[in-house]
């Protein structure tokens, strides 16, 4: 295409008019236009304007676009309309829309937002936020931060923030997400790695995370999972969560102090229904575990005296369903005989027997030298 045509606005519009009359999809028409006229002549946004204007019968090549009525943005619509539209927007898009205008931010903050799952994952100089439908990943690279967004519905989008710091960008977006007081989570999980090996700004990351959650005032989630921390830091996280809403805690490896006193004295711990600490031995006394509806735990020890406390709990609890306790018992037969005086297991294999409490509620009990399981026969957790 000659330079004369490329610099003549009317001729360029005539080329678009020709494409609009060819009755092809706009994507194909734009590709053909770029091949003939040049890729740098017009953006798809501007091509779209003229293409559909001509396609709808408005063939005036001299039309002054600047005199068109200013198109309304979403934030110009009545509040009721904005609520209807934003009700169909996913968490990714709400995060972006909050930054568009004060009106949109105010509406998004007032809308109930229930997420099935939210997780934060940190590994060295990379942090991800996962919403279930996809992820946003912040990676520190040369001269800035690479932000990658993946959604199951639309695939990948990438953005480079020159001079950006991955942790600062994460902190900003995560804080923005939690500013909505009506965000309700079914589960929230924090994963972080390499703390035990090199501690690369892990403490700073965790402290920022605690500060952001704390600033959200009332952080509501039904389930919380975290690991590679001390009991004390886990307690600091728990204290930020609404105790009446938090039902389940799952912890991974314990690093640092194993002093459990702070943890077991939080209101959140005392009102938990479900607790999991598989694959990590904990030294929390059995007294602090007996209020759970279900639990799967690795304990450092389980004595006959502990078994008596468990039996007393079975005799009175109206909420207990299931317990799986992994432990290397020094006297497994005597522990089992707390529930069945005639129990005998010479080969130390897992044996199933039953215990009936004074209220005639029946429990299935499995016992071996390394495990004790208890199930209420009326609960969904029991299986033959």
UniProtKB/Swiss-Prot annotation:
PROSITE patterns: FBOX (PS50181). Pfam families: F-box, FTH, HTH_48. Residues 71-122 form the F-box domain. Belongs to the FTH family. This is F-box A protein 224. It comes from Caenorhabditis elegans.
């Amino acid at each position: 295409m000659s330079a004369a045509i490329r610099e003549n606005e009317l001729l360029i519009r005539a080329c678009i008019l020709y494409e609009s009359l060819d009755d092809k999809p706009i994507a194909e028409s734009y590709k053909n236009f770029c091949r003939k006229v040049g890729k740098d002549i017009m953006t798809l946004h501007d091509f779209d304007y003229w293409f559909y204007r001509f396609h709808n019968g408005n063939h005036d090549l001299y039309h002054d676009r600047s005199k068109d009525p200013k198109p309304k943005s979403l934030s110009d619509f009545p509040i009721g309309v904005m609520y209807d539209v934003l009700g169909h927007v996913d968490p990714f898009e709400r995060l972006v829309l909050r930054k568009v205008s004060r009106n949109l931010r105010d509406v998004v903050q007032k809308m109930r937002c229930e997420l099935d799952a939210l997780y934060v994952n940190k590994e060295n100089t990379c942090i991800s936020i996962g919403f279930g439908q996809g992820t946003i990943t912040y990676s520190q690279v040369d001269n800035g931060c690479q932000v990658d967004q993946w959604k199951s519905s639309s695939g990948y989008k990438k953005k480079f923030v020159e001079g950006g710091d991955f942790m600062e960008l994460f902190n900003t977006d995560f804080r923005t997400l939690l500013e909505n007081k009506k965000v309700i989570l079914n589960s929230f999980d924090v994963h972080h790695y390499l703390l035990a090996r090199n501690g690369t700004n892990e403490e700073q990351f965790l402290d920022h995370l605690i500060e952001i959650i704390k600033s959200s005032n009332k952080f509501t989630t039904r389930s919380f999972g975290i690991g590679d921390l001390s009991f004390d830091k886990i307690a600091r996280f728990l204290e930020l969560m609404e105790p009446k809403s938090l039902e389940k805690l799952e912890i991974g490896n314990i690093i640092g102090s194993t002093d459990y006193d702070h943890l077991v004295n939080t209101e959140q711990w005392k009102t938990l229904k479900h607790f999991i600490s598989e694959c990590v031995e904990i030294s929390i006394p059995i007294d602090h575990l007996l209020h759970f509806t279900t639990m799967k735990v690795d304990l450092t020890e389980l004595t006959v005296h502990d078994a008596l406390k468990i039996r007393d709990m079975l005799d009175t609890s109206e909420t207990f369903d299931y317990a799986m306790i992994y432990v290397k018992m020094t006297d497994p037969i005597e522990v089992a005989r707390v529930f069945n005086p005639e129990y005998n297991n010479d080969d130390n294999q897992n044996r199933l027997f039953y215990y009936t409490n004074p209220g005639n509620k029946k429990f299935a009990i499995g016992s071996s030298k390394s495990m004790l399981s208890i199930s209420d026969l009326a609960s969904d957790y029991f299986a033959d």
